[in-house]
């Protein structure tokens, strides 16, 4: 297991949930359910309200692989929109182009999806893009660059992930043409993110 895998394993154990949505971390949590450095049934330190909010914020930050600045900007945009700020926050993160690549099964992880976008493998509405943080909207279409080796890679990823995760109803995936159409913005119950978004809103609201 490489250093990055070890670090992800520690994060999963710290949060107590599989934020990376990969089977190996479910197995890890069953084997080692306690946070790193805590053995057996050691008593947990009481967490303050601020501490709880921070944990929820960190969950989302590491789930989507975004920086602190990026997450702060997403919160500001979510607050400007109509509706529930917490729901808006998660919906904006879900509609990042790297997350769409991941949800569609074109990549085995979000980190891999970011690489795919950064390397110019994805075409958005007919134009090549290299920015993983682009937010997609209804009727946007992404597809894989016309290159046999790239298509072979993505098809292999689709095959690997097909039994691991369910395709969301708010995107339409054509596995043959290797394209994805955004149908609509996802509702909260369609987002499997394991975090309390209201606590994240409270965290940022106190710092606004």
From Swiss-Prot:
It comes from Borrelia duttonii (strain Ly). GO terms for molecular function: rRNA binding; structural constituent of ribosome. One of its GO terms (biological process) is ribosomal small subunit biogenesis. Pfam families: Ribosomal_S4, S4. This is Small ribosomal subunit protein uS4. HAMAP family: Ribosomal_uS4_B. Transmembrane segments: none annotated. Residues 95-157 form the S4 RNA-binding domain. It comes from the Bacteria. The gene is rpsD. Gene3D superfamilies: Ribosomal Protein S4 Delta 41, Chain A, domain 1, RNA-binding S4 domain. GO terms for cellular component: small ribosomal subunit.
């Amino acid at each position: 297991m490489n250093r990055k895998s070890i670090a992800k394993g520690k994060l999963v154990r710290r949060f107590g949930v599989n934020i990376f949505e990969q089977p190996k971390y479910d197995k890890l949590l069953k084997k080692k359910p306690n946070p790193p450095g805590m053995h057996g049934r050691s008593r947990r330190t009481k967490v303050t309200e601020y501490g709880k909010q921070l944990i929820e914020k960190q969950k989302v930050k590491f789930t989507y692989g975004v920086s602190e600045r990026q997450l702060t900007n997403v919160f500001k945009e979510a607050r400007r929109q109509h509706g529930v700020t917490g729901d808006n926050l998660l919906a904006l993160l879900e509609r990042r182009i790297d997350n769409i690549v991941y949800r569609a099964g074109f990549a085995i992880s979000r980190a891999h999806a970011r690489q795919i976008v950064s390397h110019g493998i994805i075409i958005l509405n007919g134009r090549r893009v290299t920015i993983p943080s682009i937010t997609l909207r209804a009727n946007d279409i992404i597809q894989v660059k016309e290159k046999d080796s790239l298509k072979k890679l993505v098809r292999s990823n689709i095959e690997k992930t097909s039994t691991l995760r369910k395709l969301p109803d708010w995107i339409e995936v054509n596995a043959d043409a290797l394209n994805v159409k955004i149908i609509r913005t996802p509702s909260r119950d369609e987002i499997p993110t394991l975090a309390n978004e209201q606590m994240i809103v409270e965290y940022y609201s106190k710092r606004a």
